[in-house]
Amino acid sequence: MEQVEILRRFIQRVQAMKSPDHNGEDNFARDFMRLRRLSTKYRTEKIYPTATGEKEENVKKNRYKDILPFDHSRVKLTLKTPSQDSDYINANFIKGVYGPKAYVATQGPLANTVIDFWRMIWEYNVVIIVMACREFEMGRKKCERYWPLYGEDPITFAPFKISCENEQARTDYFIRTLLLEFQNESRRLYQFHYVNWPDHDVPSSFDSILDMISLMRKYQEHEDVPICIHCSAGCGRTGAICAIDYTWNLLKAGKIPEEFNVFNLIQEMRTQRHSAVQTKEQYELVHRAIAQLFEKQLQLYEIHGAQKIADGNEITTGTMVSSIDSEKQDSPPPKPPRTRSCLVEGDAKEEILQPPEPHPVPPILTPSPPSAFPTVTTVWQDSDRYHPKPVLHMASPEQHPADLNRSYDKSADPMGKSESAIEHIDKKLERNLSFEIKKVPLQEGPKSFDGNTLLNRGHAIKIKSASSSVVDRTSKPQELSAGALKVDDVSQNSCADCSAAHSHRAAESSEESQSNSHTPPRPDCLPLDKKGHVTWSLHGPENATPVPDSPDGKSPDNHSQTLKTVSSTPNSTAEEEAHDLTEHHNSSPLLKAPLSFTNPLHSDDSDSDGGSSDGAVTRNKTSISTASATVSPASSAESACTRRVLPMSIARQEVAGTPHSGAEKDADVSEESPPPLPERTPESFVLADMPVRPEWHELPNQEWSEQRESEGLTTSGNEKHDAGGIHTEASADSPPAFSDKKDQITKSPAEVTDIGFGNRCGKPKGPREPPSEWT
């Protein structure tokens, strides 16, 4: 392919890269993220080591501790001076068109490295020095002044003497003629000082940059000696100037390769100098500057009568876009963003971000007509950095659609369980879905979605187990009838029931992915009658994973589920209670509720406690109606009894018409007045303070039975609690073992707290002026 065609294709490619993609980003940002990803890989995997710059004697010679010269391309100083005999300077060689040492990319000299800087200039016979920063920027010193001002006396950095013979002011830059003297020998060199390039940014116009580079090459056309280019760190602005000059030399020689690509050029430069072209704006500037050079070169070809070369070779922008799409199909899909439990300052974000690899995106589904409940496409109205708009993709019938719950549960999993059958089956669509939220900063989220987090996402409950000495070692199996949960009011309980069902579904999907079971297909849009809260089920050592149920989503035996024998191990008790809770949740019907699309990256505690999400439970004070509680006496090692509470449904206390427990109904107590307090017995105080004696294993049961009978409750036979909808059937032949007795007692929301039993019963609770019949 001839040079004219190559130049035209590049210009059209740059124009196509300016158009935003479906995420609102242009291709410059996508490519630059890939460059940062590669640089992070170089640093973390030590592909290009920087051992010399990390030495203790050289650390003070680095302006920035994270910008160190690569060992394989660093500039070594052999010229010795009385005060400096080290061979280290923070500088690297960058190869040019004709030689491997066309440029010296270095940092702005420090006060203690000015002599090293002049040693390098003298040793390598440098004639051109390009300075792309000011001495001070944003109130900080970016470079030590290593030259004298024009008209002032020469300055000496022993054994070097520098004087300024001339200074010429140009648009945005200066040209100074410096005279360098060393050991009765003098050399004349030229400094091109660009003064209008902001740090980590780009100038408003790059015409003066091209003018400076063009004039620089008039002073030195060859590459026999290197050109020294520096800014403050010697990587961002320095790399941009090197890339433009390198391409310009290729253009002058007519050697622009057919596969010329700025991405590959800068990637190659980054293997020679750390972080060459440091920002996305600088990366775009290089593209635009090179495209302008190519346009001027095309005009020269046309002026010289080369129009016949261009006949019939026009390539439209649409054709260029199609070629870019074909290139996207050859590259791997992007990986989902990973979260980290502890953020690290500095360049840690480079390590966390995944490369936004190009990949074809299926067509976006149009939003459905407005309904009574918000759908996924209407949760966020604005698509910006902190409120990314989720996008649903169309899947072919033969593919398994991506499961929204499973995809985001995988991203929020702190244990990093990503290798499963689900990932291999739905890899393509899941990764597309994750790619669209990659710009969300970690641990940041919209404050408008804070509210009551218990109503938005499910949480695993960490249960403090009782001491092994308290658990009855002769405990026997007990039967629990797990009937369907009875819901009196759909509008009050639909949110909680759907949250429970989806929490079990997320836990079940995690277990099925480990066993490599077949994944049932999931539709792109959930039907309205099946929508519920998306929950994130986190499994840790305290949270037992339920056994996978049958595919229809119900327990194999809904009416007779036998509990396992309570073991003396503390964690086993918690696992069994969590197992019982999950079975009750599983039997609850799915009700109509709004779909809450929660971003796992916005989770306040997704990775803060090593797999436990109980932090949000304690932070958000809400009324929790529990349907299962276990009370056991404390051992001598604990100061208070441990009370296990497993929340089954979440309801606000102020909601009118909340069903009361069976105890309240039997006592014929109205909604306005709380139930009468039971009479206090000495044993209730002894339980919280005194050690356990062996003969008390049966005594507390008898006392507790008497107290419950006074409230209208029975401890044997069949009980029916309307508040939780749980039928408890106590075994008749089982001895009254108090420590492992699972009394299904449902308290009103106002009475449930997270403190121990002894602390709750230490002082009677109630109104400040109780009724007379209470005393």
Curated annotation (Swiss-Prot):
<dbReference type="GO" id="GO:0042246">
    <property type="term" value="P:tissue regeneration"/>
</dbReference>
<dbReference type="GO" id="GO:0004721">
    <property type="term" value="F:phosphoprotein phosphatase activity"/>
</dbReference>
<feature type="modified residue" description="Phosphoserine">
    <location>
        <position position="748"/>
    </location>
</feature>
<dbReference type="InterPro" id="IPR012266">
    <property type="entry name" value="PTN12"/>
</dbReference>
<dbReference type="InterPro" id="IPR000242">
    <property type="entry name" value="PTP_cat"/>
</dbReference>
<comment type="similarity">
    <text>Belongs to the protein-tyrosine phosphatase family. Non-receptor class 4 subfamily.</text>
</comment>
<dbReference type="InterPro" id="IPR029021">
    <property type="entry name" value="Prot-tyrosine_phosphatase-like"/>
</dbReference>
<dbReference type="InterPro" id="IPR003595">
    <property type="entry name" value="Tyr_Pase_cat"/>
</dbReference>
<dbReference type="GO" id="GO:0042058">
    <property type="term" value="P:regulation of epidermal growth factor receptor signaling pathway"/>
</dbReference>
<dbReference type="InterPro" id="IPR016130">
    <property type="entry name" value="Tyr_Pase_AS"/>
</dbReference>
<feature type="modified residue" description="Phosphoserine">
    <location>
        <position position="550"/>
    </location>
</feature>
<keyword id="KW-0597">Phosphoprotein</keyword>
<comment type="subunit">
    <text>Interacts with PSTPIP1 and TGFB1I1. Interacts with PTK2B/PYK2. Interacts with LPXN. Interacts with SORBS2; this interaction greatly enhances WASF1 dephosphorylation and might mediate partial translocation to focal adhesion sites.</text>
</comment>
<feature type="modified residue" description="Phosphoserine">
    <location>
        <position position="567"/>
    </location>
</feature>
<dbReference type="InterPro" id="IPR047251">
    <property type="entry name" value="PTN12_cat"/>
</dbReference>
<feature type="binding site">
    <location>
        <begin position="231"/>
        <end position="237"/>
    </location>
    <ligand>
        <name>substrate</name>
    </ligand>
</feature>
<dbReference type="InterPro" id="IPR000387">
    <property type="entry name" value="Tyr_Pase_dom"/>
</dbReference>
<feature type="modified residue" description="N-acetylmethionine">
    <location>
        <position position="1"/>
    </location>
</feature>
<dbReference type="GO" id="GO:0005829">
    <property type="term" value="C:cytosol"/>
</dbReference>
<feature type="binding site">
    <location>
        <position position="278"/>
    </location>
    <ligand>
        <name>substrate</name>
    </ligand>
</feature>
<dbReference type="GO" id="GO:0071364">
    <property type="term" value="P:cellular response to epidermal growth factor stimulus"/>
</dbReference>
<feature type="modified residue" description="Phosphothreonine">
    <location>
        <position position="519"/>
    </location>
</feature>
<feature type="modified residue" description="Phosphoserine">
    <location>
        <position position="331"/>
    </location>
</feature>
<feature type="compositionally biased region" description="Low complexity">
    <location>
        <begin position="622"/>
        <end position="640"/>
    </location>
</feature>
<feature type="compositionally biased region" description="Polar residues">
    <location>
        <begin position="558"/>
        <end position="573"/>
    </location>
</feature>
<feature type="compositionally biased region" description="Basic and acidic residues">
    <location>
        <begin position="692"/>
        <end position="711"/>
    </location>
</feature>
<dbReference type="GO" id="GO:0005925">
    <property type="term" value="C:focal adhesion"/>
</dbReference>
<feature type="region of interest" description="Disordered">
    <location>
        <begin position="462"/>
        <end position="775"/>
    </location>
</feature>
<dbReference type="GO" id="GO:0042995">
    <property type="term" value="C:cell projection"/>
</dbReference>
<keyword id="KW-0007">Acetylation</keyword>
<comment type="function">
    <text>Dephosphorylates a range of proteins, and thereby regulates cellular signaling cascades. Dephosphorylates cellular tyrosine kinases, such as ERBB2 and PTK2B/PYK2, and thereby regulates signaling via ERBB2 and PTK2B/PYK2. Selectively dephosphorylates ERBB2 phosphorylated at 'Tyr-1112', 'Tyr-1196', and/or 'Tyr-1248'.</text>
</comment>
<feature type="modified residue" description="Phosphoserine">
    <location>
        <position position="448"/>
    </location>
</feature>
<feature type="modified residue" description="Phosphoserine">
    <location>
        <position position="608"/>
    </location>
</feature>
<keyword id="KW-0963">Cytoplasm</keyword>
<feature type="region of interest" description="Disordered">
    <location>
        <begin position="322"/>
        <end position="341"/>
    </location>
</feature>
<dbReference type="GO" id="GO:0002102">
    <property type="term" value="C:podosome"/>
</dbReference>
<dbReference type="InterPro" id="IPR047170">
    <property type="entry name" value="PTN12/18/22"/>
</dbReference>
<feature type="modified residue" description="Phosphoserine">
    <location>
        <position position="434"/>
    </location>
</feature>
<feature type="modified residue" description="Phosphoserine">
    <location>
        <position position="613"/>
    </location>
</feature>
<feature type="modified residue" description="Phosphoserine">
    <location>
        <position position="603"/>
    </location>
</feature>
<feature type="domain" description="Tyrosine-protein phosphatase">
    <location>
        <begin position="28"/>
        <end position="293"/>
    </location>
</feature>
<keyword id="KW-0378">Hydrolase</keyword>
